[in-house]
A protein has these predicted regions:
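Short, loop-centered acidic/histidine patches that primarily coordinate divalent metals
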Residues: 151, 170-173, 206
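Secondary-structure boundary/capping motif
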Residues: 144-145, 170
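Active-site ligand-binding patch in enzyme domains
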Residues: 2-144, 153-156, 220
Length: 220
């Protein structure tokens, strides 16, 4: 009762998405970014978090020639309704649509009269938008394939929830070490049995980078 969920990561070899100061554009090269846009065109919805939106003001569209009309519905998980009317997601909300998922009772004044569709769902134990509630609502709206492009917190949330079916991992041939920011935050692993388990389905060069495709599997 939920869409097929894909998580896209673009990192260094050691799994970093940005420097400690937040610089991230661009770790992977043009070919990997083009492949990422193709992934967007192949999904009904793209999911990100409000932290990414406030930091980067992304368009979250497919910008490949001939595929702009295949841009997915843009979905923002925004527990406290912090998305503003000046963001790209708000100013272009009609084409493609933008859906804002907030916790029930979140404030309403930030968006004004923009065309964003607001969707209220229950909160989880951390007072954040409940990921499973969002996925259920997306399925009810006819979404069958959703792509997650998000920061460490939301990526970790999807991994922890066990809802990531496919993982697309673009790795650049560079190493950042402890100076970098990890692609995923804490997912509550205290024992090896708690880890998220995936099986490698394919790996291929993409320009100077490498794409690894994994599918979710049960723990041994």
């Amino acid at each position: 009762n939920r869409p097929l969920v894909s998580l896209k990561l673009a990192t260094t070899l050691d799994g970093c998405i940005a420097t400690r100061t937040g610089e991230s554009q661009w770790i992977t090269g043009p070919a990997a970014r083009q492949r990422g846009h193709l992934l967007r065109a192949r999904h009904d919805a793209i999911i990100t978090g409000i932290g990414t939106v406030l930091a980067d003001d992304p368009a979250m569209t497919c910008r490949l020639p001939g595929l702009a009309s295949r841009s997915p519905i843009r979905t923002v998980l925004d527990s406290r309704a912090r998305l503003t009317s000046q963001s790209q997601l708000a100013t272009t909300a009609g084409d493609p649509p933008t859906w804002q998922y907030t916790c029930i009772g979140a404030p309403t004044e930030n968006l004004g009269t923009t065309a964003i569709e607001r969707c209220e769902v229950s909160a989880d134990q951390n007072n954040q938008v409940d990921i499973n509630a969002v996925l259920t609502d997306l399925a009810d709206r006819g979404i069958t394939r959703a792509l997650v492009e998000a920061g460490p917190g939301l990526s970790a949330g999807f991994l922890k929830s066990g809802t990531v079916d496919t993982l697309y991992w673009f790795r650049a041939p560079v190493v950042m070490g402890a100076d970098g920011k990890s692609a995923a935050a804490d997912i509550g692993v205290s024992d090896l049995a708690d880890m998220a388990h995936f099986a490698l389905d394919a790996t291929m060069p993409v320009g100077e980078d490498r794409l690894e495709i994994y599918s979710r599997r049960a723990a041994a």
